[in-house]
Amino acid sequence: MKKILIIILTLLLCTGCFDYKEINDLAIINAIGVDYENDEYVITLEILNDQIDKDSSKITSYTKVGHGKNLTSAIENAADKLSKQLIFNHIKLMILSKSVVENKFDNIIDLFLRNTYFRENFYFISSTDTRPEDLLNHTTNESPIASTAIIDTLESISYSSNTNILKMFDEIIEEVITYGIDTCFSNITLKDDEFIIDGMSIFNNYNYKGNLNSEYVKIYKLLTDNFDRPSYTINYDNLSFTVAINNGKLNTEINNGSINVNGNLMGRILDNDP
């Protein structure tokens, strides 16, 4: 009996995981930027440092860039520059360049639908004026991780001015593959060293149709019944009014080739300039 107990205790206390990895051996990918230049994909991986910065006591990040004729080879090229195993299931953000949304959007959707290494609940945005690589390398002492600063900007604007389209990748997928529904998502740029949400990129199926500015974003959110107290400035007869919409609903229908919008919106005047 004693021998059996000794064997059981030995098995319990001495077992381990055969595929165990030290954290220092892993490269945790926090964000991905995708560009297309000179007939090649350019992948920028934002990687979290495995050690806290001694001076600031903050977690920082760095980037690695890979090139390839397809997305997989570009990612592998970036991975070859690291002596670590890439971990993609912590991704929080993906940024697409103008050339990608214009010509390679369907390839992006296809890759991430097929690849089980990537999770689908990360924010998905475009950057039609600034390269994704430049965005993910824009860090400061206050914001040592660029993707975190971008996400903070996305979320804060969503709850304040209502001028962005905050969507996860799985939402984009659902819209793209659903007949009769076209997708859209926020566009970002870098201006005066600040991340600025610059309207939204819109699509017809997989085809990029262009960008709409922030005022159109507010209208889109009203039409889709997805608004939270947006404000509008109305200029009339040399007067200026700022009106906030509290609640209500708009209905849209197509009749004889014409789009009709009707409904009721309740709001209040926040400010006026006589």
Can you say where each PLM-predicted feature lies in the sequence?
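Membrane-proximal alpha-helical signals and transmembrane carboxylates
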Residues: 2-6, 13-274
